[in-house]
């Protein structure tokens, strides 16, 4: 699920930078460099020493919030908040340990779930998966339409 959030952030950053390129805020060389870093960036300098450094994942996440702000007027960072909560669940040093437990508000008691008892995962907003899937598709389709309208595509199959 984190990969879905991060990939949605990546397509949102590509969308944002494409708009900046079309508005001539970025040169074609700057835009090309951003795309290179976005698609080929890695921290693996042992096997890929000449590869560009990747974008920090939070820059990608923030690009998704930028899209929400521009398109829908959101004033908070909903996407980042969802990603932060999801990240907290996956870390072995904190909240992730307590996924199968309930903690009292005063933090003094932990109630463990029984072996056969289902834990109410909806408490952790897994509906974010549905939202993020839809959100990714929305950004992708809008970006693709912009590219098809504004760019000369070399192959007919890319146009349909």
PLM features per residue range, with description:
Residues 1-160:
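A cross-kingdom marker of C-terminal helix-rich interaction/assembly modules
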């Amino acid at each position: 699920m984190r990969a879905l959030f991060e990939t949605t952030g990546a397509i949102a950053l590509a969308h944002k930078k494409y708009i900046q390129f079309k508005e001539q805020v970025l040169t074609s060389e700057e835009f090309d460099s951003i795309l290179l870093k976005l698609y080929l960036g890695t921290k693996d300098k042992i096997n890929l020493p000449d590869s560009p450094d990747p974008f920090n994942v939070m820059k990608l996440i923030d690009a998704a919030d930028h899209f929400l702000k521009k398109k829908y007027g959101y004033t908070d960072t909903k996407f980042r908040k969802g990603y932060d909560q999801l990240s907290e669940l996956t870390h072995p040093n904190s909240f992730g340990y307590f996924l199968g437990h309930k903690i009292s508000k005063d933090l003094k008691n932990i109630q463990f779930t029984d072996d056969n008892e289902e834990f109410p995962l909806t408490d952790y907003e897994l509906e974010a998966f549905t939202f993020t899937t839809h959100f990714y598709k929305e950004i992708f389709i809008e970006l693709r339409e912009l590219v098809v309208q504004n760019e000369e595509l070399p192959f007919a199959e890319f146009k349909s």
